[in-house]
Each structure stands twice: as structure tokens, then as C-alpha cells.
Swiss-Prot record:
HAMAP family: UPF0597
GO molecular function: L-cysteine desulfhydrase activity
UniProt similarity note: Belongs to the UPF0597 family.
Domain of life of the native organism: Bacteria
BP-aspect Gene Ontology terms: L-cysteine catabolic process to pyruvate
Name of this chain's protein: UPF0597 protein Sbal223_1296
Organism of derivation: Shewanella baltica (strain OS223)
InterPro entries linked to this entry: Ser_deHydtase-like_asu (IPR005130), UPF0597 (IPR021144)
Length: 424
């Protein structure tokens, strides 16, 4: 196997992984669980300091197993019930009694949450205390990337900040393009990528859960009611939108099921998976073709998102759905050129969508971008594409660079304004 392909597989395995609950509050739960383990005893007070972006994405989303919202319950639950060895599934096992103890700690004023100024987009510092004992755990650059651990003021672990690598730079130094991703997905031995089929299983279960039970805004269930009433049809477009949104409904509503995430986002893992799976079912392709399409979708999304920070004012579901649309063209028997058309079309359609925090309405944004993915892949199959208009260049690689430039240079102040509005 080509060394370049092994790099691609390593990247996918590093950032396409199960995550239980929205990853920003889960980062705080994980840090708190590690701090508790370091302390050696359940703390009687917890202080949490986070970056603005992590704060933004934790304000309105339910923490799995708790039925509650926010960083305070995430940190308290992590300290009381979290498994420090479980990463993003830190809260996979939690009892009602433990939730009650976590809430009691909050009610007693023993859990504080503060925003802190930092250049890092993903930053969380948890200080857990018990009597005169104190444990500090700092996460920096990635949701489970521990940068420092201290016990009673003494350093027990630290990472040189110059060596720490944030998730946003994961493709740095790697020879990767949309074309190389497309060829890799087509040609790599099936056995090497079979693991990606777990994404279909995990995110499919979330979708089923969102359709079966009332979570969040019930976007998926609302569409199902519309189909049953004869208002809308159950075609591929509506089925993709319905089932993708349902998975997001469940995730944002605190369902106790993991999502297969993509670069730290469960919703984007869902958006990279479910439309591709349903398209594969529509075209009755083999399991191998599905795996190749999922690899194309997930790695394509990772590559595009590596051009800008991991958390920003930009809703990443847009570019994730662009990568999914590329994979959908592949499943339909389209060409590489048409796959590029699909990416261009989705980005042209939905690139104005902002991120105003993780919450129930994220399911609506997931449905919007997934709908764009379907329209765009159908247009691409007819060789209709946006080219040389607005931020869309004539070349897909240039378009991707334009997106990165727009977010890095043009949306920083937007992010600050959104956070100020949400915090007012």
C-alpha cells in the first residue's frame, strides 16, 4: 500500500471516532474525569475555564445521561461519574444518583464556569479540589488533547506548546487534495477501510432513536408527519433530510448513544454519513462501494475543514455536506469532474450559514446542508455547476482555499459578535 494512503487512514482513524454527546461540553467532562482520577478522590469543588468558542458550543446542548444543559453539569458529571480512559465516551455510564450528586454540587455553588482569553479555539482548564488537595487538567487544541496536568501545584505532565498540534492542522505536511482523496477511496484495498462502516451503524442508530422518540425540535419526526399526511413525498431528498435531521435531533437532545464524529463534531459525522448511506441504498451498491463512499465523504470533509480553525463562526455542516455530495456522485456512477461539481455547488448554496453554538436547532442546519447535498449531486450528474461566481472559483482546490480565507480573515469579528449576543 502507498505510504500516502497509510497517512490518510491514520488521519481518518485519529478524528473519525465515536463521541457520546456534543464534544464541547464533553471536553469539560473528560478534563474533570481526568482531574478526579489525578486527585484520587471525588472533589468538593470544581472550577472550569474555557475558550469563547468552547463556551459558545456548550450553552444550549444537553449532556447525555443527565437531562441537563451546560458546562457546569458536564464538568460535575465528569468528576463524579466520568471514565477518564473513555475519551469522548467519558459519560457512557452514569446513574441517576450520580446525576443528583453532580447537581447538588452545582446547587451548593461549588462548580464555577468562566470564559478565558486564549488564542486556542479549543481550550478547557478544570481545577478540582478536595480540602487542601488540588488537581489541574488543561485541554488545548483538541477535545481530548491534554496539554498539562498538575497535582498540588506540581507538574506531572505537560506538552510543549510548540509541539502540540490542533485538530485544525491535521493535514499539514500531508500530500492531499480532493483528487488524491477520490483516487484513494476508489483504489485502496477494501480490508484497509472496512472499519469506516461502523459510522453507518452508529449514526444509523442515532437516526432511528431520533425518529422513535421526541428529542429537541423533532425535525425528523415533523417531516415524517408531513409524509404521512401526504403534504410531502418520501423521495430520496426528503428521506435524507428527515433521517439526517433525526440523528441530530437525538444527539442535540442528549440521547445516550454515541455518534461517529468527524474532526470533533458529531453532527458533522452524521452529515458525512447518513446521506451517503441512503444514497447507497437507493442505488443498491455493495458494502464495499458504501465503504469507499464513506471514506471519500469523511476524509473529504476533514481535508476541507483543515483549512480553517476547528471552532469558528462558520457552520461546518456546509463543507461536510459538500464532501458527502462528492461521495453521492461516486455512488451514482458519476465522474471525478462531476464530484468536484457537487462540492462547488454545495459550497455555493450554503456557505453563508453561521455557527451560533451547539443546540437543538443544529438539526435544522444539518437538514439544510444535507438538502443542498442532494440538489448539488443531482445537478452535478447533469454537469451543472457553479464556477467562477462569488467565492466559488473555477477550480475546486481554489474554492476550498477561498473558504478558509473567508473564515480566517473575514469571520473572526462575526464570531466575537455572535458570542457577545449569546452571552448578553
Amino acid at each position: 500500500m502507498k505510504p500516502q494512503w497509510q497517512q490518510y487512514i491514520n488521519i481518518i482513524k485519529q478524528v473519525v471516532k465515536p463521541a457520546l454527546g456534543c464534544t464541547e461540553p464533553i471536553a469539560a467532562a473528560y478534563a474533570a474525569a481526568v482531574a478526579r482520577a489525578l486527585l484520587g478522590v471525588e472533589p468538593d469543588s470544581i472550577a472550569v475555564q474555557v475558550s469563547d468558542n468552547l463556551y459558545k458550543n456548550s450553552m444550549g446542548v444537553f449532556v447525555p445521561g443527565t437531562g441537563k444543559i451546560g458546562l457546569a453539569i458536564a464538568a460535575a458529571a465528569g468528576a463524579i461519574a466520568g471514565n477518564p480512559d473513555a475519551g469522548l465516551e467519558v459519560l457512557a455510564v452514569i446513574t441517576p444518583e450520580q446525576v443528583a450528586r453532580a447537581q447538588a454540587l452545582i446547587d451548593a455553588g461549588k462548580v464555577t464556569v468562566e470564559r478565558t482569553e486564549t488564542a486556542e479555539f479549543i481550550y478547557c482548564c478544570v481545577i478540582a479540589k478536595k480540602g487542601d488537595r488540588e488537581a489541574l487538567v488543561k485541554i488545548c487544541g483538541g477535545h481530548t488533547l491534554i496539554a498539562e496536568k498538575r497535582l498540588n501545584g506540581e507538574s506531572v505532565f505537560s506538552v510543549d506548546s510548540t509541539q502540540a498540534k490542533a485538530t485544525g492542522s491535521i493535514c499539514e505536511g500531508v500530500d492531499i487534495t480532493i483528487e488524491s482523496i477520490y483516487r484513494f477511496a476508489q483504489e485502496v484495498p477494501f480490508e484497509e477501510i472496512k472499519f469506516i462502516l461502523e459510522a453507518s451503524e452508529l449514526n444509523g442508530k442515532l437516526s432511528d432513536e431520533g425518529m422513535a422518540n421526541p428529542y429537541g425540535l423533532e425535525v425528523g419526526r415533523t417531516m415524517k408527519s408531513g409524509i404521512a399526511a401526504g403534504i410531502i413525498g418520501e423521495d430520496l431528498l426528503n428521506k435524507i433530510v428527515m433521517l439526517t435531521a433525526a440523528a441530530s435531533d437525538a444527539r442535540m437532545g442528549g440521547a445516550n448513544l454515541p455518534a461517529m464524529s468527524n474532526l470533533g463534531s458529531g453532527n458533522q459525522g452524521i452529515a458525512a454519513t447518513i446521506p451517503v448511506v441512503l444514497t447507497a441504498q437507493c442505488y443498491k451498491v455493495s458494502e464495499e462501494q458504501l465503504a469507499r463512499a464513506l471514506i471519500m465523504s469523511h476524509l473529504g470533509a476533514i481535508y476541507i475543514k483543515s483549512h480553517y480553525p476547528p471552532l469558528s463562526a462558520f457552520c461546518g455542516n456546509t463543507v461536510t455536506s459538500a464532501a458527502a455530495s462528492m461521495a453521492m456522485v461516486y455512488l451514482a456512477g458519476g465522474s471525478f469532474e462531476q464530484s468536484c461539481f457537487a462540492i462547488q455547488n454545495v459550497i455555493s448554496d450554503s456557505s453563508g450559514m453561521v455557527c451560533d453554538g451547539a443546540k437543538a436547532s443544529c438539526a435544522m442546519k444539518v437538514s439544510t446542508s444535507s438538502s443542498a447535498a442532494v440538489r448539488s449531486f443531482l445537478m452535478a450528474l447533469s454537469s451543472h455547476n457553479v464556477s467562477g461566481q462569488g467565492i466559488i472559483a473555477t477550480d475546486v482546490e481554489k474554492t476550498i482555499k477561498n473558504i478558509g480565507k473567508m473564515i480566517l480573515n473575514g469571520m473572526s469579528s462575526t464570531d466575537v459578535t455572535i458570542i457577545d449576543i449569546m452571552s448578553a
